[in-house]
């Protein structure tokens, strides 16, 4: 059922949540950069030089401070301080600093600072500069007997412009640009506290819990408060079989509060889950049996307060665990949150003006989810994963354009949210090949068939996705890397015709995403590495979203310091 929700002011609103099948989703093989894991959390190390976060279902770091590490690789020894600084040809600075140290024998500290921005506008378009800043601090202690505590705070500031207007085709005055293509800022302040037992011995009760708080607000008055609580209990015992493979019973509990407003009226939502389970494993199998009960306050009358979904998964290992067959049935609901939506699409319409509505956020509901596939490691050289996914989802979200009339013309550069019921089938493949000790190839492919009930297409969701990353160590000092990202089969719902009192809408196929980057690192010594990156080599002006092209080719250069 496609859904048009109604806001508090009796205006029509389209709304969306989010689910995207991902090739690198659960229990993936070693296909992403690994860092050594100390007893405390590392700050985020991702730096993305693009003008807005394009969340491919196959994400890769364009600039990575750490290299790839396979199962047999020797991990890089962590340093207390890592700093990366560079500049792109579009006045695009990138900066990353992370610190990790043990303040005492039982107290660890992690600090992270990140900045990336671009200050030159895209030719012919409205102002398109952007800036992303982040800061976080984490502490972890194991001072207390049998318990580990961790906590931290963070701050994020993201600035974008609603630049999706071609001024060569639709000239605007400075006043009109300020009104229809304004600057937008999103600020997020948050913190977390975690507790976990350090002992998991047979016959003992283990537990873990996390408390999270997040406050997000934008320039135009939209605000969201979020509180999340997760707590898990587990008891392990040898009720039968091999003493080296005990069984486990457990209970996972969750509670969330989300309060969002774009006006003076606050929309409060509450979500909870209860998930009892039983686990057992042996040399050749693993089995997880559970059931999930969740409840959420409803905005749409058709939505139920309570829902029960399966939580079942298992694996079968053969050939001395070189080959794994896995399958699972899952489901459940997830709150669609303002902070998560604008992180994916920062061009959401949040400014409340006369004759305009604002977005409503519901709960995405996976009524049934199946996943299955095989994983294998061939001769310690090739990691291969083949899988299939199926999702039957209610309140599945899509982005749709909003429009403004300007001097008998139409501007479409902000997005609202639309829900529909969907059935999605995905075929996935991941492979990682390591030849000798110098050449590594990572390949990924996904075919997605998403069928909405009422919408003509699954707006902005790609049918085909692919990735390729090659890393080659020429010698002890010089290394090269190449990344190719591809997406095809994306459609946008756009304005097709209009009169004095109505707008017509129709589908348009977007240009395929083809993004190739070439990079190199030169190790001056153990502390200093110089890097260069040529991004979007083919100078493709593909669109992140309709009317939002990327900048094209750009050259980055800088240094990485470890000390």
Region locations from a protein language model:
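Outer-membrane beta-barrel transmembrane domain signature of Gram-negative proteins
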Residues: 186-196, 210-284
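Exposed, low-structure sequence patches enriched in small/polar residues
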Residues: 78, 83-86, 114, 284-563
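Membrane-embedded beta-strands of outer-membrane beta-barrel proteins
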Residues: 97, 135-137, 191-195, 229-233, ...
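Outer-membrane beta-barrel translocator/receptor signature
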Residues: 64-65, 74-83, 87-123, 127-135
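Surface-exposed extracellular loop regions of Gram-negative outer-membrane beta-barrel proteins
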Residues: 101-123, 244-260, 267-298, 434-449, ...
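Short loop/turn motifs that connect adjacent beta-strands in outer-membrane beta-barrel proteins
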Residues: 71-78, 103-106, 142-149, 198-206, ...
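N-terminal periplasmic/intermembrane-space "pro-region" immediately following the signal or transit peptide
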Residues: 7-73
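Flexible loop and strand-edge segments within Gram-negative outer membrane beta-barrel domains
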Residues: 118-130, 136, 150-206, 210-226
């Amino acid at each position: 059922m496609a859904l048009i929700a109604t806001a508090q002011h009796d205006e029509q609103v389209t709304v969306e949540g989010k689910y995207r099948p991902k090739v690198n989703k659960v229990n993936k093989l070693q296909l992403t950069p690994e860092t050594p894991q100390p007893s405390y959390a590392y700050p985020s190390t991702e730096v993305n030089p693009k003008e807005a976060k394009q969340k491919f279902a196959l994400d890769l770091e364009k600039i990575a401070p750490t290299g790839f590490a396979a199962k047999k690789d020797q991990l890089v020894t962590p340093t207390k301080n890592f700093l990366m600084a560079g500049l792109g040809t579009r006045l695009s600075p990138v900066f990353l600093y992370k610190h990790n140290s043990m303040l005492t024998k039982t107290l660890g500290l992690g600090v992270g600072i990140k900045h990336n921005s671009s200050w030159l506008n895209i030719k012919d378009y409205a102002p398109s500069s952007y800036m992303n800043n982040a800061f976080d601090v984490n502490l972890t202690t194991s001072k207390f007997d049998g318990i580990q505590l961790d906590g931290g705070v963070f701050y994020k500031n993201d600035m974008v412009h609603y630049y999706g207007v071609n001024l060569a085709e639709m000239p605007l005055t400075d006043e009109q640009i300020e009104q229809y293509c304004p600057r937008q800022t999103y600020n997020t302040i948050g913190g977390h506290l975690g507790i976990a037992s350090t002992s998991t011995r047979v016959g003992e009760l283990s537990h873990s819990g996390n408390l999270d708080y997040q406050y997000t607000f934008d320039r135009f008055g939209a605000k969201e408060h979020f509180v999340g609580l997760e707590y898990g209990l587990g008891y392990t015992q040898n009720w039968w079989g091999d003493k080296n493979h005990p069984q486990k019973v457990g209970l996972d509990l969750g509670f969330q509060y989300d309060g969002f407003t774009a006006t003076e009226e606050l929309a409060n939502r509450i979500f909870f889950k209860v998930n009892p389970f039983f686990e057992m494993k042996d040399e050749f199998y693993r089995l997880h049996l559970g059931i999930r009960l969740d409840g959420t306050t409803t905005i749409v009358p058709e939505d139920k307060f309570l829902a029960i979904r399966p939580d079942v998964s298992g694996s079968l290992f053969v050939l001395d665990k070189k080959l794994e067959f896995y399958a699972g049935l899952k489901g459940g609901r997830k709150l669609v949150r303002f902070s998560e939506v604008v992180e994916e699409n920062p061009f959401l319409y949040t400014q409340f003006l006369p004759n305009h509505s604002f977005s409503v956020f519901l709960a995405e509901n996976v009524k049934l989810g199946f996943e299955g596939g095989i994983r294998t490691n061939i001769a310690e050289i090739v990691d291969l994963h083949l899988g299939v996914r199926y999702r039957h989802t209610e309140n599945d979200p899509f982005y749709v354009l909003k429009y403004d009339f300007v001097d008998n013309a139409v501007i479409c550069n902000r997005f609202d949210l639309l829900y529909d019921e969907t059935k999605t089938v995905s075929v996935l493949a991941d492979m990682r090949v390591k030849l000798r000790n110098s050449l590594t190839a990572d390949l990924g492919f996904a075919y997605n068939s998403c069928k909405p009930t009422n919408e003509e297409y699954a707006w902005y969701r790609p049918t085909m996705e692919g990735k390729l990353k090659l890393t080659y160590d020429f010698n002890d000092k010089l290394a090269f890397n190449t990344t190719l990202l591809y997406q095809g089969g994306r459609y946008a719902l756009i304005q097709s015709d209009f009169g004095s009192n109505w707008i017509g809408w129709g589908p348009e196929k977007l240009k395929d995403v083809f993004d190739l980057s070439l990079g190199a690192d030169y190790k001056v010594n153990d502390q200093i590495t110089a890097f260069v990156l040529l991004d979007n080599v083919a100078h493709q002006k593909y669109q992140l979203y309709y009317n939002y092209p990327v900048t094209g080719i750009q050259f980055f250069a800088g240094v990485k310091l470890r000390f």
